[in-house]
Amino acid sequence: MGDNLKVIEADSVSYDYPDGSAGVREVSLEIFEGDRVGLIGANGSGKSTLILLLAGLLRPTKGKIRIFGREIDKKNVEEIRRKIGVVFQNPDDFLFNPTVRDELLYVPRQLEWSEEEMENAVKEYAEMFGITHLLNKPPFRLSGGEKKKVEIASVLIYKPEVLLLDEPTAYVDGKTKRLILKILEDFKGTLVIATHELDVAEKLADKFVLLNLEHRIEAAGGKEILKNEELLEKAGVI
């Protein structure tokens, strides 16, 4: 999907859940530096599973995932994961620190940023997402839209090279959705977004992978996929 450095490669990847149900089947794709890829499909097509596989958070049942040319193992897992930011569909799966400020600083503290660097970053991203007034509040007391903004801010703050997003605009109001999309449009790294919202996919991506309800790739290509109603209907998207 490009001429630059290959960032993520999936080679005939399948994943089965412990109960035997299929996550994805025989998925192969290549994502290059600077790519903006939309994983589109109906609910249950395997988009979320594929995001977790591409992030190295699940291990394939079959096939291989390579990130920056390497399979993840105990020796390189921390190094690789610091280059990748993952935004989960449900912020409650991610937010666990006592305050919003602590959420924003969780990774910077692990990376041993200076106090000045951390304070400057908190100020920048809190203002960017409109959450300055929430910095001292516990995340569990926030609304769904506020939680989503905190989650995305806490990933972007450490400037990952690759951003993997699972339904980043789900369950938010129109104003919050527009803010999130504007910020993600400005992200300069490699971006992969899983979504069933075609307008979101079209706004953030220029290359697309369509997953069908058999958990396989139905098609891959450019924005012409979004205009092919027959193909989208076959995959259960419309």
Swiss-Prot record:
Cellular compartment(s): Cell membrane
tRNA-binding is among the record's keywords: no
Gene Ontology CC annotation, any one: ATP-binding cassette (ABC) transporter complex
Disulfide bonds: none
SUPFAM superfamilies xrefs: P-loop containing nucleoside triphosphate hydrolases
Enzyme class: translocase
Protein keywords: ATP-binding, Cell membrane, Membrane, Nucleotide-binding, Translocase, Transport
CDD domains: ABC_cobalt_CbiO_domain1 (cd03225)
SMART domains assigned to the protein according to its UniProt record, in alphabetical order: AAA (SM00382)
EC number in record: 7.-.-.-
Topological relation to the membrane, as annotated: Peripheral membrane protein
Known role: Probably part of an ABC transporter complex. Responsible for energy coupling to the transport system.
PANTHER family linked: HEAVY METAL TRANSPORTER
Family to which the UniProt record says this protein belongs: Belongs to the ABC transporter superfamily.
Name the UniProt record assigns to this protein: Putative ABC transporter ATP-binding protein AF_1841
Organism: Archaeoglobus fulgidus (strain ATCC 49558 / DSM 4304 / JCM 9628 / NBRC 100126 / VC-16)
